[in-house]
Amino acid sequence: MQRPRSATCVGVRRRRPPTTALSIATQFANTCPQVTELGAFAGPSSTTEDCLYLNVFTTGTGGRPKPVLVWIHGGGNFDGETNDYDGSKVATGGPLGTPTVVITINYRMGLFGFLSESDLNAEGHPFANYGILDQQAALRWVRANVAAFGGDPNNVTLGGQSAGAINTAANLISPAAAGLFQRAIFQSSPIPNQYFLPEAAAVTLGNNFAAAAGCSDAACLRALSAERILQLQGTPNANGPFVFSGAIVDGTIVPVLPETAWTTGAYRHMPMLGGTTKDDGGGNFGLGIAEYFSGPPQVAVTVDQYNANSPAVKQQYPLASFGNDPQLAQNRIGADPFKCDARRVLTELATTNSGFPVYGYDFTYQNAPYYFPQMPNAASPTGHFQPLAAHTSDIQFVFQGYHGGNLGVNLDQTSGQPRELQGAEITLSDQIVGAWTRFAKTGNPNGPRLPTWQAFTPGNGPFLQQDTPNSVETDAQYNANYKCEFWASQEASQ
């Protein structure tokens, strides 16, 4: 493992673009400063700003240059780390794919990575998206150096999961990333507008943060300790007023909202692959992560949370159909609009991505081991439990052993005992790794012994349904499964 890094972004270097240096390592480096109040979902505690490292997984430098996969970790842009992503299997391609140089990267997060504030902006530089700039610095390093690790600098795929997918989209839109990658993978994020913060709102947030910190100039903001910044940032809920999960539309690094780009074609066109898990947007957010939020417990979430739309939602999702269990209802009500956002964005991209294919998937396997210890005994009034294809449950099928956060293991969803992938799950992992690496090499996820995967077209789909076994899901089936026409009508009425 090689560990190139960027210079430490502290003191006068804070709120500025990164610069690069190189060190060789045999173990992972520091994680970037982040909130740690999210239990199993959080990464390890860190206030160390010497964290801008990347990791290289390669099978060697012999033979023809290999495709390159640069991976951006998720975590809402407020937590996460590269250390939990073992790229060894992807580097080999597994039994069905092709050898690939895998590079995982750290980047500044939270208020360290995303802050637009009047005094900083008055310095005349477009540096609100420091985290995106870190990613672009990593991509430039890849272009200059990956050949030494057996990689092809002209065949780079940028991918990520959750916030990593959001950031992949930001780089796809960003003029500053032009020429740095040739394909894109969006895993478990639909990338609609709501994950990006308009500049005016970002400046208001940044000015409020400066006021809360007692700062009246940029020098004061740069002098704040990491501990103080994290304290003010708070946890990612209503009690964390300076937290948001996305990039800032600053007009320069990220010039427009994503769906403006998707519908007008104002992005770099290239082969793309994206999808979500069956219970994305529900699942762990409804049954698990809420108990880690500070503030009042969010256990008995019901359809009443939809305010003016509640009557229509209740009619579409009658509680009786979920055994009168509000937790199970919340999972579906949370997941379906997330799923439908993904379908809408895939449709937009397939319409405007001139000359290049878009591939869509729906990860529906619901029995994978997972890292929330309370999942087997989900707190619900009726005691029901339903295995889930929850947010992040698919990462371990790409990056072997991924377990999220600090629990250290994945747990069987039924027994609660630690376990790894087994049997048909390993076959599914081989297929996904094979598809991802074939896509990285050629822009097409098809290959010998891999499931046939058709390109997505508006109104037809199809989605590759990733399960044991795989199947094909038409656009009409997906629309019906996740009630997309209903959710489109609710968005239109707001």
Pin down the residues of each PLM region.
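Catalytic-loop region of hydrolases
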Residues: M1-R64, E227, L232-T235, G240-P241, ...
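Short Gly/aromatic-enriched secondary-structure transition segments
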Residues: M1-T19, G286-Y306, P451-F456
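Short, solvent-exposed loop/turn elements at domain surfaces
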Residues: R3-C9, L111-G113, G281-N284, P369-Y371, ...
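Serine-hydrolase-like catalytic core of hydrolytic proteins
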Residues: L38-R222, T235-N237, T252-L287, L407-G408, ...
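Substrate-gating cap/lid region and adjacent catalytic-acid/histidine neighborhood
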Residues: R228-G423
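Alpha/beta-hydrolase-fold serine-hydrolase catalytic core, especially in secreted/extracellular enzymes
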Residues: T352, F356, L411-Q494
